[in-house]
């Protein structure tokens, strides 16, 4: 999968979901949705750690993660949701996601003296 394919499909679906206008949500609303998903990723990671340490965890039936594999997969799914919303937020503020991701990744590599660049 290429990022451009995800960005295009994501924007199309968001427009469909928002009756043809994803811009009816402002940047703060898209950021809030992204933060909600990031919070869910954090919660899944917490549950994973409890499983790793064999610490009891009381969960609602629909949020019960009984195995480390299930918890790891849930962390990954919530991270994916976060990324999907992050791409919509970047779209909403009118910035090219590939350009900004490349710029930020390369700047961090330069800052720490790492050779990796994209």
Residue ranges and their predicted role:
Residues 1-118:
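Flexible "arm" and connector segments at domain edges
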């Amino acid at each position: 999968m290429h990022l451009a394919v995800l960005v295009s499909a994501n924007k199309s679906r968001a427009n469909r979901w928002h009756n043809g206008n994803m811009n009816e949500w402002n940047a703060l609303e898209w950021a809030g949705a992204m933060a909600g998903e990031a919070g869910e990723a954090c919660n899944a990671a917490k549950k994973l750690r409890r499983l790793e340490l064999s610490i009891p965890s009381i969960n609602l039936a629909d949020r019960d993660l009984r195995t480390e594999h299930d918890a790891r997969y849930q962390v990954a799914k919530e991270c994916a949701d976060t990324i999907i919303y992050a791409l919509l937020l970047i779209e909403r503020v009118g910035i090219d996601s590939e350009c900004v991701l490349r710029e930020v990744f390369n700047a961090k590599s330069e800052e720490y003296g790492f050779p990796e660049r994209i």
